[in-house]
Amino acid sequence: MNRPLLLLLALVAALPFLLLQLSGTDDNAARRAKSAAPSDDDSWREPITVYCAASNQAVMETIIADYRHEFGSQVFVNYGPSQGLLAQIEVSHTGDLFLPADASYLESARDKQLVSDVFPVARMKAVIAIRRGNPKAIRTLADCLRGDVRFVQANPDAAAIGRLTRATLQRQGLWKSLDQATTAYRGNVTEVANDLAVGSADTGIVYDAVLHDYPGLEFIEIPELQDATSDVEIGIITESKRKASAMRFVEFLTANDRGRQRYREHGFEVPIDPTEETRSGSSGE
């Protein structure tokens, strides 16, 4: 798919969300106009928009609920595959924060000057998802290639888990056989998990943390994917008009007793005392 068409599709996909965001923002502005003008100290209360990977949706919803309860601030979220979100940011020039499933998308965004400061959050690992009890006796990557196994995975050109899987297995010369054995490609990692949950697939590759909300599924780790991990980070969008509010949400998200605690509860790997230093876009680190 060529780049102009990809960007056009991303804009079309984002249009309903952007209209909702603008509507909500207008409503908030109208309410503020009826009251006294806010002081500079209230700038962090302005509503913000987060572009968030589908793999982080469950934990993000929990964190946002906590944030609204504590501060009463509005947070709009657009969920989707990481590449699609990046394309939407590039086309629309809107939003305040970008949280893809893998830090490599933030590197691409910084190269395009779409994000500035970036902050570490958590880590996920690629695993083989199966239905609880393992009815198909899937224990190895080779088992996923069997003729009686329906194997699905996320599109490597759209989703972080798909790109990570392809890159990892290509280095080992294993990608072609898995690609040929794939029954279907899905738009994002949660769609893969949903296929297993409803019984339309037997196995697939997902991030381990995604299965936190799928009690009927479990996962196995295989040596071929032992190095397939994704660092989850959040970046401030360069053209954000609400940087004070965006920074307040980042501080909440990355606090050990707030957002990071929720990430631990949802099965993500989070250091007990992670470094909270900002990786500036100009630092080159």
Regions found by a protein language model. Give the residues of each.
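Exported/periplasmic ABC-transporter solute-binding proteins
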Residues: 2-78, 83-93, 100-112, 119-124, ...
